[in-house]
From Swiss-Prot:
Gene name of the encoded protein: rpl2001
InterPro entries tied to this protein: Ribosomal_eL20, Ribosomal_eL20_dom, Ribosomal_eL20_eukaryotes
Gene Ontology molecular function, alphabetical: structural constituent of ribosome
Native organism taxonomy: Eukaryota, Fungi, Dikarya, Ascomycota, Taphrinomycotina
The entry's keywords: Cytoplasm, Ribonucleoprotein, Ribosomal protein
Family: Belongs to the eukaryotic ribosomal protein eL20 family.
Organism, scientific name: Schizosaccharomyces pombe (strain 972 / ATCC 24843)
Protein name from the UniProt record: Large ribosomal subunit protein eL20A
Amino acid sequence: MALKEYQVVGRKVPTEHEPVPKLFRMRLFAPNESVAKSRYWYFLKMINKVKKATGEIVAINEISEPKPLKAKVFGIWIRYDSRSGTHNMYKEFRDTTRVGAVEAMYADMAARHRARFRSIRILKVVEVEKKEDVRRNYVKQLLNPHLKFPLPHRRTGVVGLAGKKVFAPHRPSTFY
């Protein structure tokens, strides 16, 4: 699922009783504008008692990442409905964008808890600035500046077909 981050601003329709109603802004993750509007009204009805029939959307904007090439750690607070009830959870993900971290969170929740998009509510997504503030060990291990990955399988040979042998006297050893 290719998600995008949207900022949706809406309010109640102006009336004689309330000529300048209060604006409500939300940042939502959705695959398209239509789903973003739908989720907006779903949350607004729960939180602020404003229904789609008595409200209007003032603006909807797609939010882009300011530094999409820098790896960052994101903390995500969620509330999800499982078969046994509603649970609060905090998770951390290392990614280059907020949208990438949220997509990883949805995949992780589906894999570990069988929770789908419709049953997960994102409360807050925050970039964790300092290494000391990272809570989860599975993210802390990636913050080592001298991190190295092993080369478990070596493939030797000549690039191209010019020096390739048809028959070899023994199988090559490809492990270090």
